[in-house]
């Protein structure tokens, strides 16, 4: 059996780039909660003792940007300079302007257009991917890396590993077998965890706790064997972290947000963007399409691409590839996808309920991945029953 290795990485919520994603999405939540028609393009950057929020927002909502920044930092665990940022004493800068009237008239006619008339907020192409190798219909390498990161945060916050600090990264290499285009995981080849820690803990304690409390509960035993390689804090020291260790910026973890390097990516980030931004809404609808194709048994693996022009409601193109795993020809599956999914941005927003903010709805997406999550707020994860009678006629 010929196998190959594939690697995916993740970072947890205390990574400076992910901190920025979460702040941007917390701002989006606050705007949409009060005004579902808010037009939001919110970027965040951070460095030692500083968080800056900037971008273009047109909203009727009354938003306390500084409070959102401080609350988000505090909830992650940035409560002192020692851990990388002090939520209550860091400097917060806000540079927010209104959405360009040129964009507003072209996309939504200054809020006068009907949902089916709303154009894409920009040009671009987005990809959705699904695979039958996990219950989540996501790549195993990505699922495991993401869950390790989430578990790191869990054992930090519940006190199981009190030496942990907010920042951390994970990476998992999986050995795969290609079964006529479908991906079959064989074993976990390598597990890498680099986590921020306090001064009190030894490297031996770190390695023991990570194996016992993070790796064992996350990675199924069947994937681990005596040959599995573990790199646990291989640099030897990771005390300085968060924005003190590295600058952070919204939209720099787009592969972690999606499929861990599998499938493809059009390059657009998600966080801080309202649903007229097809970088986000377009990527969500093609994930639902790809997942529905696989979950309905039409293929074992599927990628869907959609593309847009600014101000134009209808997509320019829709593409489907099942990597040779389709039960019917790809052109038939494409026909089914087009019949069952409305790719117009205004209709995506309605069908996936993307104008609803509040309660951390989009904040939740900003750490541990936008896809493969078991949460009713992740409406794009709902599998649509696909009617294929027409396509097979």
Swiss-Prot record:
Its main location: cytoplasm. InterPro entries: ADOMET_SYNTHASE_CS (IPR022631), S-AdoMet_synt_C (IPR022630), S-AdoMet_synt_central (IPR022629), S-AdoMet_synt_N (IPR022628), S-AdoMet_synthetase (IPR002133), S-AdoMet_synthetase_sfam (IPR022636). One of its GO terms (cellular component) is cytoplasm. One of its GO terms (biological process) is one-carbon metabolic process. Mg(2+) binds at residue 9. Keywords: ATP-binding, Cobalt, Cytoplasm, Magnesium, Metal-binding, Nucleotide-binding, One-carbon metabolism, Potassium, Transferase. HAMAP family: S_AdoMet_synth1. This is S-adenosylmethionine synthase 3. It comes from Petunia hybrida. The gene is SAM3.
């Amino acid at each position: 059996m010929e196998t190959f290795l594939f690697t995916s990485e993740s970072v947890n919520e205390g990574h400076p780039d992910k901190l920025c994603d979460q702040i941007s999405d917390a701002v989006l939540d606050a705007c949409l909660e009060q005004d579902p028609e808010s037009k939001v393009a919110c970027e965040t950057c951070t460095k030692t003792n500083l968080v800056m929020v900037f971008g273009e927002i047109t909203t009727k909502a009354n938003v306390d940007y500084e409070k959102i920044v401080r609350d988000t930092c505090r909830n992650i665990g940035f409560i002192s300079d020692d851990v990388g940022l002090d939520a209550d004493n860091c400097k917060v800068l806000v540079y927010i302007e209104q959405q360009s009237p040129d964009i507003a008239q072209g996309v939504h006619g200054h809020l006068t257009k009907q949902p089916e008339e709303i154009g894409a907020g920009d040009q671009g192409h987005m990809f959705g991917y699904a695979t039958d190798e996990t219950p989540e219909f996501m790549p195993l390498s990505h699922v495991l890396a993401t869950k390790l990161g989430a578990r790191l945060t869990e054992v930090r916050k519940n006190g199981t590993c009190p030496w942990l600090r907010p920042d951390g990264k994970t990476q998992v290499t999986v050995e795969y077998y290609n079964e006529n285009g479908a991906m079959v995981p064989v074993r976990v080849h390598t597990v890498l965890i680099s986590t921020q820690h306090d001064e009190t803990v030894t490297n031996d304690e770190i390695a023991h706790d990570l194996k016992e409390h993070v790796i064992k509960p996350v990675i199924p035993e069947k994937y681990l064997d005596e040959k599995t390689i573990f790199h646990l804090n291989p640099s030897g020291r990771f005390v300085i972290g968060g924005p003190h260790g590295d600058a952070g910026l919204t939209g720099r973890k787009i592969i972690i947000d999606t499929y861990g390097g599998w499938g493809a990516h059009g390059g657009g980030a998600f966080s801080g963007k309202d649903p007229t931004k097809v970088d986000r809404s377009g990527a969500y609808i093609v994930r639902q399409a790809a997942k529905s194709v696989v979950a309905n048994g039409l293929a074992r693996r599927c990628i869907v691409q959609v593309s847009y022009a600014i101000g134009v409601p209808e997509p320019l193109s829709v593409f489907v590839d099942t990597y040779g795993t389709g039960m019917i020809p790809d052109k038939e599956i494409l026909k089914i996808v087009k019949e069952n999914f409305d790719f117009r941005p205004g209709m995506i927003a309605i069908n996936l309920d993307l104008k609803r903010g509040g309660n951390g709805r989009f904040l939740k997406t900003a750490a541990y991945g936008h896809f493969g999550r078991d949460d009713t707020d992740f409406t794009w994860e709902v599998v649509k029953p696909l009617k294929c009678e027409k396509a097979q006629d």
